[in-house]
């Protein structure tokens, strides 16, 4: 009986030792400071923005757009490795991890602090400083853009930059691809928590934009040419005579002004620079001096330039300007 009691005691002691050994092991790995940071990075790597955002201490600055804190906006993170986990005063740990953003090798350091324990045994942690960062996006030519394929739109003036909160680390590829506009992709690595990274998206008019503007202007010129007056209303061409006109003026288009489209500075509009077209006018004119009648049958050159606004639904508003 005594031998049995000794066996039971030894077994129980071994069980207790094993239990506390597991507690120590878990507190040095899963429930450690670097284990906490690892769970954040792993969530980003598997594009799980919800889990990453719900971790203690992940806080977005007040009043800053959070559109990019989504699964679709996350880039690719790989080869995540612990570099060091250093304890500092006040229970704060500085944890550094290395990783790859695309083909780039990067590293980030996070400050975490122990907040409590689970069941009195397992450590709980929180970010002492939020791991989020900010990208300040300037869209001088078109408010619409994409981040890693996720459609976004700036809500500020074209001359301003709008801040967006993002997870750090992350590789964010900015571009624009709408009906009439395209922008070359810009890859922006964000590695430092609380950092602010400026981004400028230089959109350009695509071939369809120029084609559609040519079409609309050609229809406009054709409507002008149908007016049987010397000075067609709200039209870029016309002709005046000092003598008397004795027949109905007849216009026809000879050549439309060429169309080239570029950004209108930082106004958020587009500009068609000054170009020359030719309209043809046929009309009979009577001299006030001797009463003779002659026919004016010639081309009439005219110059135009335009600004174009693109609405969110891609409707084009083309306005003539004198530049």
Regions found by a protein language model. Give the residues of each.
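Membrane-lipid interaction segments
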Residues: 211, 215, 219, 223-323
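Short beta-strand edge/turn micro-motifs at domain boundaries
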Residues: 100-188, 301-323
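Amphipathic alpha-helical assembly segments used for oligomerization, scaffolding, or translocation
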Residues: 19-33, 37, 127-142, 207-210
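Hydrophobic membrane-insertion alpha-helices, especially the h-region
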Residues: 4-26
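Structured interaction patches on ligand/partner-binding surfaces of diverse proteins
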Residues: 179-209, 297-305
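Core segments of small alpha/beta cavity-forming domains
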Residues: 26-72, 204-243
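Short solvent-exposed beta->alpha transition segments
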Residues: 45, 49-106, 234-263
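Extracellular Ig-like/FN3 beta-sandwich strand-entry sites
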Residues: 90-92, 167-171, 274-278
């Amino acid at each position: 009986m005594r031998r049995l009691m000794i066996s039971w005691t030894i077994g129980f002691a071994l069980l207790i030792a094993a239990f506390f050994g597991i507690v120590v092991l878990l507190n040095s790995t899963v429930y450690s400071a670097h284990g906490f940071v690892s769970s954040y990075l792993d969530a980003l790597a598997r594009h799980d923005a919800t889990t990453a955002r719900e971790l203690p201490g992940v806080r977005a600055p007040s009043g800053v757009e959070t559109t990019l804190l989504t699964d679709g906006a996350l880039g690719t993170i790989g080869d995540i490795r612990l570099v060091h986990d250093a304890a500092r005063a006040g229970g704060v740990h500085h944890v550094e991890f290395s990783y790859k953003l695309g083909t780039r090798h990067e590293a980030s350091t996070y400050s975490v602090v122990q907040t409590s324990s689970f069941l009195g045994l397992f450590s709980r942690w929180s970010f002492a400083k939020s791991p989020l960062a900010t990208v300040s996006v300037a869209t001088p030519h078109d408010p619409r853009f994409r981040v890693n394929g996720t459609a976004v739109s700036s809500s500020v003036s074209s001359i301003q930059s709008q801040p967006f909160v993002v997870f750090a680390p992350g590789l964010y590829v900015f571009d624009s691809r709408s009906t009439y506009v395209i922008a070359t992709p810009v890859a922006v690595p964000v590695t430092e928590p609380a950092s602010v990274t400026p981004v400028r998206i230089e959109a350009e008019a695509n071939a369809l934009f120029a084609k559609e503007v040519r079409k609309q202007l050609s229809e406009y010129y054709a409507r002008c040419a149908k007016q049987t007056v010397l000075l067609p209303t709200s039209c870029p061409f016309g002709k005046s005579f000092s003598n008397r006109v004795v027949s109905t003026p007849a216009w026809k288009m000879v050549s439309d002004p060429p169309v080239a489209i570029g950004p209108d500075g930082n106004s958020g509009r587009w500009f068609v620079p000054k170009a020359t077209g030719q309209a043809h006018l046929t009309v009979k004119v009577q001299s006030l001096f001797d009463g003779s009648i002659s026919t004016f049958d010639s081309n009439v050159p005219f110059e135009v330039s335009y600004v174009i606004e693109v609405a969110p639904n891609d409707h084009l508003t083309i306005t003539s300007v004198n530049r």
